[in-house]
Regions:
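Extracytoplasmic/periplasmic substrate-recognition and gating elements
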Residues: 47, 52, 147-149, 233, ...
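Short, solvent-exposed loop/beta-turn-alpha elements that line the ligand-binding surface or hinge
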Residues: 105-113, 197-223, 275-276, 288-296, ...
């Protein structure tokens, strides 16, 4: 009797133990994609991951980029941060500096990161994030409006822009919108052309830190700023009117409505513009503002995944990152974002309208947007100065660039 009872008890305990062992691990993941206006196919990818890894359950929490900076930072500091965090280069630097991110250097996917991006996922030669996308910043051009004015191709430099603007204005078409309320759009043009005059990564690094190069003394940056006045004088845009236009609202509406021929913006708008009936457009590289230079594909290293150094589920977290490193999975994300793959041999998801941009990128006419290399304070100074420049576009470019130098120190 005792032996039968002991055997039965052991059997029950074995079943309970097996159930405990079989219980799925819950992985807390936060990100600013996957909700709001950018679902980014994340729900489908989570479902696919859970199907392939039935022992892991993803608990995804959507929060904005701004909230991520404050809320997640506080949770990490308090020891109750998520297991996996969506990051960008700026957040990677911040959290790695506080020793809050796991070193991923030994992961199998590290050598597959595109060589032009790999260094930007590292600090001190160690890898701390898995990149998810490269997103282009380029020039949107309304092909019907260009054709109406007799402009055969999207301009690639200042001289072509001036000629195109003259034809467009003569045809009664607003040639260009350069929204300057936030300063972002004109700054993107200047940064792309300024950094393209040499090794872009090295130049970006050279302008920050003690004893570094000076924007105000750099010929390429001075010429790039001055070129904006040249374009204004050529009737490409009206500076004071553009100073009141937001790149994130009014500017998008104006281009989408077919009321402007050209506007610099990000590839993340391609899906929205493609869904607009009757809007025929191309997404091209940014035109060169520096004499002798070619057009520039301004690539921005977008979102990435990192792992909390204090996670209790490191193996499950690494499986989540390895899942995203697979080209078929990342492609589904890129399809929604109209992005480039950050992996060697990865498949890009750029639609036909973006082929001019893709060609420039593949030909090496690329500048990586220096977010994470330049501080948030420097970018704020850049954007504010560009907005102010549109109120007084006759000012000396060197004086404007001196404000950048002050913020870079």
């Amino acid at each position: 009797m005792f032996n039968r009872l002991r055997t039965a008890t052991f059997a029950v305990l074995s079943v309970l133990a097996a159930q405990v062992c079989a219980a799925p691990v819950t992985l807390d993941v936060t990100g600013w994609k996957g909700g709001g206006a950018e679902p980014a196919n994340l729900a489908a990818l989570i479902a696919k991951f859970e199907k392939e890894n039935p022992d892991i359950k993803i608990k995804f929490e959507y929060m904005s980029r701004n909230d991520t900076t404050t809320v997640v930072s506080s949770r990490l500091q308090g020891g109750n941060g998520p297991d996996v965090l969506m990051v960008d280069r700026e957040l990677m630097r911040q959290w790695q500096g506080a020793h809050q991110l796991l070193d991923l250097s030994s992961e199998k996917w590290v050598p597959t990161i595109w060589r032009g991006v790999r260094a930007h996922t590292q600090i001190g030669g160690k890898t701390y994030m898995l990149p998810m996308e490269l997103v282009g910043i380029g020039l949107f051009a309304n092909l019907d409006l260009l054709k109406r004015a007799g402009v055969a191709m999207v301009p690639t430099d200042v001289d072509q822009l001036k000629a195109a603007c003259g034809k467009l204005a003569a045809a009664g078409v607003t040639p260009m919108l350069l929204p300057a309320k936030e300063g972002w759009a004109p700054a993107a043009l200047v940064i792309a052309s300024g950094l393209s005059a040499g090794d872009a990564d090295a130049r970006a690094e050279s302008f920050v830190g003690a004893g570094s190069a000076r924007f105000a003394a750099d010929p390429a940056f001075k010429q790039s700023v001055a070129a904006l006045k040249v374009l204004a004088d050529a009737k490409c845009f009206v500076p004071r009117l553009n100073d009141g236009v937001s790149a994130w609202s009014t500017g998008l509406t104006e281009f989408q409505a077919g009321r402007v021929a050209m506007m610099p913006q990000g590839a993340w708008n391609i899906a929205k513009f493609s869904a607009t009936k009757g809007l025929s457009f191309q997404f091209a590289p940014l035109p060169a503002l520096v004499s002798g230079n070619g057009p520039v594909a301004l690539d921005m290293l977008g979102t990435a995944w990192a792992i909390n150094a204090a996670t209790h589920q490191p193996d499950a977290a690494k499986k989540w990152l390895a899942f995203w490193a697979h080209p078929d999975n990342d492609r589904r994300f890129l399809d929604a974002e109209a992005g480039f793959s950050p992996f060697e041999g990865g498949t890009d998801a750029m639609p036909p309208q973006a082929q001019p941009y893709a060609a420039a990128q593949k030909n090496g006419h690329v500048v990586l947007y220096p977010k994470g290399v330049w501080t948030g304070g420097l970018f704020t100074a850049i954007w504010n100065s560009m907005s102010a420049y549109f109120l007084d576009i006759g000012q000396d470019p060197a004086k404007l660039l001196a404000r950048w130098d002050g913020a870079a120190r």
